[in-house]
């Protein structure tokens, strides 16, 4: 028997194009993406957690959804169904493409030298790239759903689709990535 995500989508055919993110994006076949915190004991164990569960965990960061994992998993499942209907592609592959396109490659850090503080451009680790991408996708979806007729699932689907196409005009996550990289480039 083949295990599919939510019993619908096959994650065996999903490919990660970015070599730096390959070991941090986990698309291992799982029926329901809920590990109950098993991968939080060690610092880099979150790389073993399925990306759909990590997205649901980031959606729970909002004060209204705190602790409502079943609710956020239902939102993510509905968003993946919307993505499949619109793009006619595997929604897990679209999510992987969105993560690759919305994670910044470089950002700035504050360095103090002799009483003078200035910004210095630094490369971003793959783990932080993914964390930032998840945070910006979840934030973009919840912000666009606020005081809007669209549901959070529809807004999340829009955000993931636009981020997978690297659409800077419509995707909050890609816009934030470009902004961070622009600031880092000026701080070189």
UniProtKB/Swiss-Prot annotation:
GO cellular component: small ribosomal subunit
InterPro entries referenced in this protein's UniProt entry, alphabetically: Ribosomal_uS7, Ribosomal_uS7_arc, Ribosomal_uS7_CS, Ribosomal_uS7_dom, Ribosomal_uS7_dom_sf, Ribosomal_uS7_euk/arc
UniProt keyword annotations, A-Z: Ribonucleoprotein, Ribosomal protein, RNA-binding, rRNA-binding
Any Pfam family: Ribosomal_S7
MF (Gene Ontology): rRNA binding; structural constituent of ribosome
Single biological process term from Gene Ontology: translation
Gene3D superfamilies linked: Ribosomal protein S7 domain
Domain of life: Archaea
Subunit (UniProt): Part of the 30S ribosomal subunit.
Reported function: One of the primary rRNA binding proteins, it binds directly to 16S rRNA where it nucleates assembly of the head domain of the 30S subunit. Is located at the subunit interface close to the decoding center.
Family named by the database record: Belongs to the universal ribosomal protein uS7 family.
Entry protein name: Small ribosomal subunit protein uS7
UniProt organism field: Methanococcus maripaludis (strain C5 / ATCC BAA-1333)
Taxonomy of the source species: Archaea, Methanobacteriati, Methanobacteriota, Methanomada group, Methanococci
């Amino acid at each position: 028997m083949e295990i599919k995500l939510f019993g619908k989508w096959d994650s065996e055919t999903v490919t990660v194009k970015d070599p730096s993110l390959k070991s941090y994006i986990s698309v291992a076949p799982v029926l329901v993406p809920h590990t109950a915190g098993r991968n939080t004991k060690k610092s880099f164990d979150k790389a073993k957690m399925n990306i759909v569960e990590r997205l649901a965990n980031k959606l729970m960061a909002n004060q209204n959804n705190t602790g409502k994992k079943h609710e956020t998993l239902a939102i993510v499942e509905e968003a993946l169904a919307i993505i499949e209907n619109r793009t006619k592609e595997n929604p897990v592959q679209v999510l992987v493409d969105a993560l690759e396109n919305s994670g910044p490659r470089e950002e700035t850090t504050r360095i103090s030298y002799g009483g003078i503080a200035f910004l210095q451009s630094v490369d971003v680790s793959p783990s932080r790239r993914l964390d930032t991408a998840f945070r910006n996708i979840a934030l973009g979806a919840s912000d666009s759903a606020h005081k809007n007729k669209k549901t959070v699932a529809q807004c999340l689907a829009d955000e993931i689709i636009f981020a997978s196409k690297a659409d800077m005009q419509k995707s909050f996550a890609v816009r934030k990535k470009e902004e961070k990289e622009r600031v880092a480039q000026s701080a070189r």
